[in-house]
């Protein structure tokens, strides 16, 4: 089943064309990684997919339900009530966590399920405790973000996204703000989600991790998808731009 479908997406910031006719389909249980140099449009594509940025052109649907349609060459968004229901299909983990600093861990996890999804507090708190256990964060329920390491904050952010029971989980460079040791903690969690067949779209600079975990990889540059395929196909590509990009990582 197709969980996410984007067709012919274009996005401009003033005179700068950031996305140039990009299409993306993600199926149930698939892990898709998006790689490429800074400024290639990776994060903008993710923000368009999660309705944080508006597309100038293109359409978008989740599980066959249209969020954005094309009319006369322009994107037309559904009404807010429809978009609100569609947002329930996905979760997003940011590179800088975006936890509420004045909420403790438990409230960061439970606030949206209780007040937005109108779920029962007992059920929500039980789910939160189970997720914190899976994240290796038992005992941190009453801690505030300022009392946690970066790796712990990112694991709380992942747990918070999972609290809403999303069909698709998006990651926008989830380890870019972490040192190598803490990066390993977060990648371990994402790896475990992949083993559970969680549908994920991951923007990342972790090349070895992308190669290991992904069913499919997109290499973007200057607003277009230059190479797309399995990890083996992408990392063995003879495309000169792809080879040059990978060469810079191997030289580090």
Label for each model-derived stretch:
Residues 58-72:
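Conserved ABC transporter NBD signature motif
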Residues 163-167:
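A short, proline-enriched helix->beta-strand linker immediately N-terminal to the Walker B motif
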Residues 169-172:
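Catalytic Walker B motif of ABC-type/P-loop ATPase nucleotide-binding domains
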Residues 228-229:
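ABC ATPase "signature
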